[in-house]
Amino acid sequence: MLLLQALLFLLILPSHAEDDVTTTEELAPALVPPPKGTCAGWMAGIPGHPGHNGTPGRDGRDGTPGEKGEKGDAGLLGPKGETGDVGMTGAEGPRGFPGTPGRKGEPGEAAYVYRSAFSVGLETRVTVPNVPIRFTKIFYNQQNHYDGSTGKFYCNIPGLYYFSYHITVYMKDVKVSLFKKDKAVLFTYDQYQEKNVDQASGSVLLHLEVGDQVWLQVYGDGDHNGLYADNVNDSTFTGFLLYHDTN
């Protein structure tokens, strides 16, 4: 082995003779010193090929946050979106403050008041049974809806009417009935007490149509005709409209 190494050394020297002269001391470091021990005959091999790239290493740790940048410019206005669905009705809000009073309105038309009334009395005690009693003593008959010549009230305004009568009874019993359109609707009977003046009365509500007639008359024979009146005792018949029909 030593012989082979010396031979290689001699072969190397001529290749460098034409160049600069190199001493043995300068070349000595380039030679690998022979190993010692059991492998004293080892010789350096030819350098191998470069190895493959290793696997990528792990990602490094996150760096510290940078400083906040400056605010950017506002972007352009985007297109108008589609109309959304109608939302649910919200809760009722609190009651507002009262508003200021409005202006006074123009005067309205006066409502028309329907009037129909009469109040009459008996001037004589002479009456005929079974015919209308003619009350000729007029207390009130401004609308002239009562006719003293016939003793009848004639309806000119349809509606609800109130009728009443107060009869003085003397010398005989009395039977009086109130008629509407030839039909008795109310009856009053009073039995005379000797040496006394009695009173008989009655009242009723009736609905009348235009043209209806209402009156009083004594019914029965002459024995039941104690109807009486003088200058201190009256027998009266009264009626008036309460409500007129609106349709």
UniProtKB/Swiss-Prot annotation:
SUPFAM superfamilies: TNF-like
Tissues and organs where the protein is expressed, per its UniProt entry: Synthesized exclusively by adipocytes and secreted into plasma.
MF terms (GO), sorted A to Z: hormone activity; identical protein binding; protein homodimerization activity; protein serine/threonine kinase activator activity; sialic acid binding; signaling receptor binding
Ranges for domain Collagen-like: 45-110
Alphabetized PROSITE patterns for the sequence: C1Q
Activity control mechanisms: Polymerization and secretion of adiponectin is inhibited by succination of cysteine residues by the Krebs cycle intermediate fumarate, which leads to S-(2-succinyl)cysteine residues.
Domain spans labelled C1q: 111-247
Identification of the protein by name: Adiponectin
Originating organism: Mus musculus (Mouse)
Gene field: Adipoq
